[in-house]
Amino acid sequence: MKNVKTLIAAAILSSMSFASFAAVEVQSTPEGQQKVGTISANAGTNLGSLEEQLAQKADEMGAKSFRITSVTGPNTLHGTAVIYK
């Protein structure tokens, strides 16, 4: 039982510290950061879901921030974003 509690506490703490390093969505080019690439993602009809997928891809690429540059599609949304480091 003690191991289960320790495991749960470790999982919660690791997710909290990981979130502090997550890429941040920005509205313009961040000062002191450079464009390092672009990413794209497809989602359902929910804009929030598309934003989450783009944020996850930005994190995987090691970006500090990302800026969504386009969103298209009436049924399945497709979005692109510029990533910065």
Curated annotation (Swiss-Prot):
Keywords: Cell outer membrane, Copper, Membrane, Signal, Stress response. Disruption phenotype: Disruption of this gene increases copper sensitivity, induces stress response genes in biofilms, increases aggregation and cell surface hydrophobicity, and decreases indole synthesis. Induction: Repressed by ComR. Induced by copper via release of ComR. Induced in biofilms and by several stress conditions. It holds the Pfam family YdgH_BhsA-like. It is found in: Cell outer membrane. The keyword Transcription does not apply. This is Multiple stress resistance protein BhsA. It comes from Escherichia coli (strain K12). The lineage of its organism: Bacteria, Pseudomonadati, Pseudomonadota, Gammaproteobacteria, Enterobacterales.
